[in-house]
Amino acid sequence: MKISIINSGSGNIASLKNMLSFLGYNPVVCDQVEDLNKSDFIFLPGVGSFDNVIKNLKQKNFYDYLKEKKNFDNSILIGICVGMQLLFESSEEGTEKGLNLLSGKIKKFSVKNIKVPHMGWNSVFGDNFYKNCNGKR
């Protein structure tokens, strides 16, 4: 099984790689589009500014590749943090267009008493869909 992590120039790539390694996988950090070929899973991490990560993806040619869903029809794409937001059309927190793989726009929190970004650990409970991760830390 080939697991690829896109080097989006943002995100905690080392932590993601370490977690996948801990689970017994051998993830590959990809710096160019060609590295994604024949991936079973593609992780798109990102931290910080929506626009910054989009610009990084464009600079490395990942943006155009990811916009064309047919390029990874046989792969599962998983967005983490800002990487998940990039899958949508756009964000109220930026001017760049998203990948438009999912319909919708990322909205800014309007509630003032929510601490953003949320930092720290939470309890996570799996379900049958994620049974291979059940009980793993």
Model-derived regions: residue spans:
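Short hydrophobic segments within beta-strands
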Residues: 6-8
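Short acidic low-complexity segments
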Residues: 27-38
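Short glycine-rich hinge loops at helix-strand junctions in the catalytic core
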Residues: 24
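Extreme N-terminal starter segment of soluble prokaryotic enzymes
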Residues: 1-4
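Cysteine-nucleophile active-site neighborhood
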Residues: 48-118
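Short, Asp-centered acidic motifs that coordinate Mg2+ and/or phosphate
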Residues: 41
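Active-site oxyanion/phosphate-handling segment shared across diverse enzymes
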Residues: 121-137
